Amino acid sequence: MLRSLFGRNRKRKGVGATGPAQDDSIRSVKVGDVLSIQGLALEYDDRYFYVEKIHRYANEADTWYELTCVDGDTHIWIDWTDGYDLLVTATDDPDPVGLGSIGLTEEQLIDLDEENSIDNFIAVDGERYDYRNSSEVAFYQDNRGEGQGLYLWDFLREDGERLLSISKWEGRPFEATFSEVIAPDSIKLYKGERTHPGSRRPK
């Protein structure tokens, strides 16, 4: 899960006074589109993924989206936020791990949340992950409905190339997931049908 990793509570950029321009970036993605992705560690450069689902997350400061993308039996999950900068992460691992697997405890997470300091960090498998944010979040499945609450902690690996997100849903154990930070221009979007006039699928 993804928010303002490189700064806390930064405001979203406004739309320019001249009106929105044609946007072929991930910002304009919709269910039914197709995308390709380059630069992911597991090398899917020659694969084309169908965007099957789009979920939305939001807290007081930011909104971000999670795409479920499929190509045959292969799934990838792409998160993106457009707060201060367009920031994108991706993973092909659907299975979270528990806190014990990464050497953390609930008490440590509570302390990190209360201290709320980006000077804090944790070590996972000998690698440093810097604390970036923690907050209560609303999850909107398929970008609809009233939303379901959860709590999230985000940590960014020291080199800025990997994100660790830890979530806590009511009635469920803590879940930790890893994803890879990728350049926004490494994703090429092939738009499907649009309901508004003048929209065409890029060649």
Where do the language-model regions lie?
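Mixed-charge, low-complexity intrinsically disordered regions
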Residues: 1-203
